[in-house]
Amino acid sequence: MIEVIEKIGSKEDFIHFLYLLSKDFKKNLQEWENQTIPDFLEQMASWIEDYSTCPANNIEWERIDYKVLAQIIYMGKIYE
């Protein structure tokens, strides 16, 4: 999955990644540490808190559009 993430360069690539992640969850549930939405979201937040202060961090946190990211995640809740 890391190889797919490293190649994301467009909206289409990101959508493809989301579908792959969904298929992976269905096929390999036992490999997922966070098997519920609350656990998944809480650990995503925890990872951001931890990794954003890590010296090995290679993410440009100030360049992320957090409002768009929040909207994408929220739409997963309400979109039919």
Predicted regions and their residues:
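Amphipathic alpha-helical binding modules
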Residues: 57-80
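N-terminal acidic leader/helix
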Residues: 2-30
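Amphipathic protein-protein interaction modules
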Residues: 30-63
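Amphipathic alpha-helices that form helix-helix packing interfaces
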Residues: 21, 44-47, 69
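Alpha-helical structural motif
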Residues: 13-17, 40, 65
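Surface-exposed polar/charged interaction patches
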Residues: 11, 24, 47-50, 54, ...
